[in-house]
Regions:
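Conserved beta-strand hairpin/beta-sheet module of binuclear metal-dependent hydrolase folds
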Residues: 2, 9-90, 196-218
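Residue-level marker for buried hydrophobic side chains located in beta-strands
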Residues: 56-58, 101, 132, 213-215, ...
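Active-site metal-binding loops of divalent metal-dependent hydrolases
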Residues: 8-9, 60-63, 105, 137-138, ...
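Metallo-beta-lactamase
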Residues: 78-92, 96-108, 124-186, 240-256
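Cap/insert and terminal regions of metallo-dependent hydrolase folds
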Residues: 74-85, 202-296
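Metal-dependent catalytic neighborhoods of phosphoester/phosphodiester hydrolases
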Residues: 110-122, 271-275
Length: 296
């Protein structure tokens, strides 16, 4: 099995919102803001093939579904569907994808499911041959969002996914589509039912898989958020998220599971370590994956 990091459309969002209650004097060491206080963000997907005999895409980024006014409001930098172009550059088309795994349905993670915006055209799903995996608890949230996060969802998307006949809701550690090859866990600090997907590693120690890769989604958007106290203003429950992040990182450190970041503009994957003060940190950083073996 090989892994690719697949670039999607990029964003610029307010740095204060991305770093919660961390002061600018701290976070600007990690991300340089522009004149409008916005920082650069990637919307990176992970491609794995063959995984359980399938070609699997973990998330789709923000895509190009926004009309021009909303694209500007949310800082989307390109009007074309960059993820589809990046798939092509890696030797794949969106029709080749067998499974799309979605950590959650916020637009910056699921917008790439849709064709680019065009005047007068209704939203249209891409990936016509793929099974779409969504966490069952988060599916309920997407259908009945809270006023605080309603704007983060694409109103038409749940109905389109359901009408496709290829939606699988996941409510445990494994899915029908991917079997034992991918292990799922769930988090509620960012959004209810956030689904974290771990590609199971090649080694087993004391009955536990070692050496895989986990898609961190918005539990840990990039390297700065590996630090336990750092959360986003977008998180619904920062204290819960910190507790979930601690347990998550302790587990991944113990089992040698690498972290894959979706929003870090410079780093696709890293190893979690403890620094000389015992704090979690990212090390052995990898900027891009190009047909990289899982065990490499």
């Amino acid at each position: 099995m090989k892994l690719w990091s697949i670039k999607g459309n990029t964003q610029k969002l307010d740095g204060g919102a991305m770093f919660g209650n961390a002061p600018r004097a701290m976070w600007e060491r990690w991300a340089r803001p522009d004149a409008a206080n916005r920082i650069d963000l990637a919307c990176r997907a992970l491609l794995a093939s063959p995984l359980n005999g399938r070609t699997v895409l973990f998330e789709t980024g923000i895509g190009a579904f926004f009309e021009p006014e909303l694209r500007q409001r949310y800082g989307v930098q390109e009007d074309r569907h960059v993820l589809v172009e990046s798939l092509h550059a890696a030797g794949f088309e969106h029709e080749d994808i067998d499974v799309v795994v979605l950590s959650h349905l916020h637009f910056d993670h699921a917008g790439g499911l849709l064709a680019p915006w065009a005047e007068g055209r209704a939203p249209e799903l891409l990936f016509p041959n793929a099974t779409y995996l969504v966490g069952a608890a988060h599916w309920q949230r997407a259908q009945h969002p809270h006023p605080r996060d309603r704007a983060s969802f694409i109103p038409e998307l749940p109905a389109l996914l359901e009408a496709s006949g290829r939606l699988e809701l996941v409510d445990g550690p494994h899915s029908r589509a991917l079997g034992d090859a991918v292990r799922f866990s769930f988090s509620d600090g960012h959004t209810p039912g956030l689904m974290l997907a771990e590609i199971v590693g090649p080694m087993t120690v004391d009955g536990q898989p070692h050496g895989g890769v986990v898609f961190c989604a918005d539990l840990i958007p990039g390297r700065p958020w590996v630090h336990l106290p750092v959360t986003m203003g977008y998180d619904r429950n920062a204290e819960l998220l910190i507790d979930e992040k601690r347990a998550f990182l302790e587990d991944k450190l113990a089992r040698g599971v690498r972290l894959f970041f979706t929003h870090d503009p410079e780093c696709a994957m890293a190893q979690v370590v403890r620094d000389d003060k015992g704090r979690f940190a990212a090390a052995h950083e990898v900027a891009e994956l190009r047909a990289r073996p899982l065990a490499a």
